């Protein structure tokens, strides 16, 4: 396939960016931001803290989105000028610079196009992710830890801060489970389709006969709770247990009972936190995780009712979504979107944007049915 002419490529980027601006309705966003700025300037705003939080949060989001789109428009205009300059002066270094900026601009517009699909009620939230080892023994525990690293590397590549809330180590190697937050807007919307079972096929490094092993790990993604969600948990509905934090191989890492396990009695949901320094901090974090799980449970119940009215079924937590084959060949393939790559090393190092973008489109198509 012949490479696209730079001028045609720039026209295509201009058309796509104009389409994004139309979908987002930039003039309406500016009007709403101006109205919220007037509200934020009102000295009496914080007389109602909940409304104040809503106003300031929405204003911050709108301002960031407007800056992002306006910044892309300016970058596109600058690249056009750069190409004109390179051609007028027959300047190859300037042309090379313009081509590199055009490639970066295309990636930024690709990302923004995906962002326009994230219009669900909770899509703009931060993501709370839990990874659990499933069938496969020590290989499954090792696989769960590999997945944890994959998602942390993905977040790092995008500059998203992460916070590990809890890690339960397996006896021999790997982890039984881990929970972490990705502290960036829209990461719930981006990662929601990662929810499900991930299957690994490889030669087991723990088998002295070097046999092929299949192992499974589950990924659970829920939105981080906000105060406006009103997830109230009465004290008589929970049981709180404390224990000592443990590290790899079951080794104790704390001499005090600072780790906290909270059981929600009506639902049986159990959450733990042992990564904070004090029992009080661990309890507060565990309660936040429990609230997020209850919010997701409420959301799933509402989705199930809607699906029942439509005569549909909802995807269960245990649904296998992706295969990672390292032997006898190299292939990562998503079973829903059909996206695949032989670059298994890159995927396991966090290069999963192609899968995440396709997952966003797949989820939006399902929700529009």
Curated annotation (Swiss-Prot):
PROSITE patterns named in the record = RF_PROK_I
Which compartments does it reside in? Cytoplasm
Q: Does the keyword Cytoplasm apply?
A: yes
What's noted about post-translational modification? Answer: Methylated by PrmC. Methylation increases the termination efficiency of RF2.
Point out residues bearing the modification N5-methylglutamine. 251
CC annotations in GO: cytoplasm
Q: Which domain of life is it from?
A: Bacteria
Q: Which UniProt keywords apply?
A: Cytoplasm, Methylation, Protein biosynthesis
One Pfam family from the record? PCRF
| Keyword Protein biosynthesis appears in the UniProt entry | yes
Listed InterPro entries = PCRF, Pep_chain_release_fac_I, Pep_chain_release_fac_I_sf, PrfB
Can you list the disulfide-bonded cysteine pairs? none
Fetch the SMART domains from UniProt.
PCRF
Task: Briefly state the protein's biological role.
Answer: Peptide chain release factor 2 directs the termination of translation in response to the peptide chain termination codons UGA and UAA.
Give the protein family.
Belongs to the prokaryotic/mitochondrial release factor family.
Q: Read off the HAMAP family from this record.
A: Rel_fac_2
Q: Under which name does UniProt file this protein?
A: Peptide chain release factor 2
What are the top taxonomic ranks of the organism? Bacteria, Bacillati, Actinomycetota, Actinomycetes, Acidothermales
Gene that encodes it: prfB
């Amino acid at each position: 396939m012949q490479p696209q002419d730079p001028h045609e490529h720039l026209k295509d980027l201009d058309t796509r960016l104009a389409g994004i601006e139309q979908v987002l309705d930039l003039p309406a966003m500016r009007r709403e931001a101006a109205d919220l700025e007037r509200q934020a300037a009102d000295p009496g705003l914080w007389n109602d803290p909940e409304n104040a939080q809503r106003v300031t949060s929405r204003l911050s989001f709108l301002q960031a989105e407007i800056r992002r789109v306006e910044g892309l428009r300016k970058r596109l205009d600058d690249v056009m000028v750069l190409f004109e300059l390179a051609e007028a002066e027959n300047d190859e270094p300037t042309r090379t610079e313009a081509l590199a900026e055009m490639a970066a601009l295309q990636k930024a517009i690709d990302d923004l196009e995906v962002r326009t699909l994230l219009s669900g009620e909770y899509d703009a939230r931060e993501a709370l992710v839990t990874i659990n080892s499933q069938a496969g023994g020590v290989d499954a525990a090792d696989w769960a830890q590999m997945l944890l690293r994959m998602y942390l590397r993905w977040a790092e590549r995008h500059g998203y801060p992460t916070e590990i809330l809890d890690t339960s180590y397996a006896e021999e190697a790997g982890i039984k489970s881990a929970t972490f937050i990705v502290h960036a807007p829209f990461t719930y919307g981006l990662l929601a389709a990662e929810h499900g079972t991930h299957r690994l096929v490889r030669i087991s490094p723990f088998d002295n006969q070097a046999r092929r092993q299949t192992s499974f790990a589950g990924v659970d993604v829920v939105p981080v709770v906000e105060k406006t969600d009103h997830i109230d948990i009465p004290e008589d509905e929970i049981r709180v247990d404390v224990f000592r934090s443990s590290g790899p191989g079951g080794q104790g890492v704390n001499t005090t009972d600072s780790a906290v396990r909270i059981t929600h009695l009506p639902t049986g949901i159990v959450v733990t936190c042992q990564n904070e320094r004090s029992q009080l901090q661990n309890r507060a974090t565990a309660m936040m995780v429990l609230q997020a799980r209850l919010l997701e449970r409420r959301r799933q119940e509402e989705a199930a009712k809607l699906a029942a009215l439509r005569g549909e079924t909802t995807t269960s937590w245990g649904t296998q979504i992706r295969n990672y084959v390292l032997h006898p060949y190299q292939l990562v393939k998503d079973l829903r979107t059909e996206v695949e790559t032989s670059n298994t090393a890159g995927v396991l190092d966090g290069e999963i944007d192609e899968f995440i973008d396709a997952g966003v489109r797949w989820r939006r198509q399902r929700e529009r049915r």
